[in-house]
Amino acid sequence: VKRSPFITLTHVAALLSTTLVANVQAQDAGFVSRIDLKANQTPIRTDKNAEAIAQIPAHFKFVTPGKLTIAVSALSSPPLSLLADDNKTLIGSDADIARLVADGLGLELKLVPASWEDWPLGITAGKYDAAIFNITVTKLRKEKFDFATYRIDTLGFYVKSTSKITSINKPEDVAGLKVIVGSGTNQENILLGWDRQNRASGLPLVQPVYVTDDAAANLSIQSGRVDAFFGPHSIGAYKAALTGKTRMVGKGPTVAYVAVTTQKGNGLAQPISTAINHAIHNGSYAQVLDRWGEDDEKITQSVVNPPGIGD
């Protein structure tokens, strides 16, 4: 029987108390993450927003009438996406943001688990109305998609808690290291760019390591087969808080935005942005990020197609 790729609350409870899941000192400026997975199964809702609803183009056809179909990660990537106690309900900050957007637009939410490789084609082909996948706004992506921002994109370098590595903040710090990174991601571009600089300086090469299974990534770090993980800070901080087996040693060099992604020119990005701003103003947005330990990645206003990486 094929096992679910998700970490469920039942699995987590074997490691930690179900009432107080995490209260661990993280690496950045005394940040403390306190995440109660049991309580976080209860949805955070908001009301309809007339302005956002009025901005939906009259000609727009949703994938399923009356529903907002949003692609989210099919792999376990807490706090962004994981399964609840019933082993089927998607929870996490991405699902919570999706629900706030759907509520604001007066629609029922339909979440569709998908792979990172699938969302671009799915959006282009009209399989999904939008994707919430920790997608960073870049100049290249804006040529094909529209974006409504909902979070600051912070990247982090994480190592085994007993690693001798103390700092990764510049290209020479990754010289000769094996680093787990996602294919086709912003962090991969940064890592490969640093490697090119190191090659030009005659420094040892970095070896990117690509894994699609979270358990394999964790095992690779703990066994010493790889030196570091470079990816979304929210995911790295969650793992560090959950097990205490990893720690952050640096952040990525660029600050960008994570955004709800829609088909280019279909007119849906603006009403989504308005719905997010409605949630920001009434406090439901802050509730979502706070309860998933992402409070240091809040935005004060959602915007459509902001300057991105490469602009």
Q: Where on the chain are the PLM-derived regions?
A:
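Extracytoplasmic small-molecule ligand-binding "clamshell" domains
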Residues: 32-134, 291
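Acidic, polar ligand-binding/catalytic clefts
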Residues: 99, 108-173
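Short helix-initiation/N-cap motifs at beta->coil->alpha
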Residues: 110-121, 166, 206-219, 254-256
